[in-house]
Amino acid sequence: MSDTVKVGFVPLSTAPRGILVAFCDESLRLGAATDKALGGAAELIQRAAAAARFKGKDGAVLDLLAPQGIKIQRLLVIGTGKSGDHKEKDFLKYGGTLAGKLNAGTEPVMVMAELPSGPMTPDQASSLAAGIRLRAYRFDRYKTKKKDEEAAVSAAISLAVADVAAAKKAFAPRSHVTDGVILARDLVNEPPNVLYPEEFAKRASALRKLGVTVEILDVPAMKKLGMGALLGVGQGSARPSRTVVMRYNGGKKGDQPVAFIGKGVCFDTGGISIKPAGSMEDMKGDMGGAACVVGLMHALAARKAKANVIGAIGLVENMPDGNAQRPGDIVTSMSGQTIEIINTDAEGRLVLADVLWYVATKFKPKFMIDLATLTGAIMVALGTEHAGLFANNDDLAEKLLKAGQETGEKVWRMPLGPEYDKLIDSQFADMKNTGGRHGGSITAAQFLQRFVSDTPWAHLDIAGTAMGAPKSEVNQSWGSGYGVRLLDRLVWDCYEARS
């Protein structure tokens, strides 16, 4: 897992050194402990703010050389906007903002976890710390020469808090979730010659150290199960396909598990229906759903979530070859349903079809959610701000929408219905793997729905959010790790919020 900045907690009364980070609202007021740490220099700071036209707007930053006579070299003041009720995602953002202003160096950094109204709560301070870690992430392990501006923050960062023990306790689970996001980012960012199905499965097996049971299904095992849809996708690759099933039991013995399923196309050329050359290199990220599931399982197991959870990922390469799947082929899925292949570049749904059926029938989960960089059509519809949400269960959909609002990993519900489902009927088989030009993300979801039986189910099309999305306060990486925080919050809301 990629290294990121080290964050710790110290008492609010600690004397600052090096770089000091403070917070103010639109009145430009500082907290009492911050003002004391600055030796009563608030008036001087207000004059500097006026000269810089800094008004304390939410996320704005005032960057100053420290006033003379104070034992710090630099002062960063971050605006929090109007005083009022700030959400967890706001403090995550503030942490990312301040980390973005810190250069690589050895100067100690102290962050005054204090608002003008008083000290931040342990939850607020821990969200701030998580935001710092997420923003500081870099994936540069293959660079032999690094520019100064590309270097990660190297100094340790101390958050000055009112209650150190409470802040550490609140941060522990958030730190594990952050580790899960970082793991997911690492997997998405890896080059495809390094991260192929067998290697991906090997990395997922490292979760055993956290008490996760990991089972790896090889090609003979999948053939025995009848996973013809998944195996058809990978038959043109020299790299054999894999399905990885991860089980974490943190809930009550005998309770139904919940399940998360990820599309893991480690590289997608499109197969015989080959993609254009432009930006094909981005298809190393077509396993963003599987990366999220592995990162999520890490987060849940490490923080000891109180739920029984299944994570399952189908891992393939979609390559053109003399043995590759052809348009016109008909394959038989594990469910027994037959599928006519119209376009070999609509492969992710074939992978998911068998894994969804396997999980639904073997584990009978309370609900299951799949994640996939499934369609370009969802990016046409929603851009890169929201993942597409499709569901056969309104309660599950509402819980996902709520978790998205709380974490900032937003989803937008899209329609399903028989009018769309009939578009994937085939003349020669039970169904075909594409439904035509229009409503492409919807017909892809309708295809998946045919493999979930009566299980409450949601599908997240993360093609616009998992990779190459616009950079944000908490993510400067090509691979975003989208979905780990969203689904961790869902598990928390469903199983732990009242415990």
Swiss-Prot record:
GO terms for cellular component: cytoplasm. One of its GO terms (molecular function) is metalloaminopeptidase activity. Its cofactor is Mn(2+). Belongs to the peptidase M17 family. Mn(2+) 2 binds at K263, D268, D286, E347. Its EC number is 3.4.11.1, 3.4.11.10. PANTHER family: CYTOSOL AMINOPEPTIDASE, LEUCINE AMINOPEPTIDASE-RELATED. It comes from Bradyrhizobium sp. (strain BTAi1 / ATCC BAA-1182). Binds 2 manganese ions per subunit. The active site is at K275, R349. HAMAP family: Cytosol_peptidase_M17 (MF_00181). This is Probable cytosol aminopeptidase. One of its GO terms (biological process) is proteolysis. Keywords: Aminopeptidase, Cytoplasm, Hydrolase, Manganese, Metal-binding, Protease.
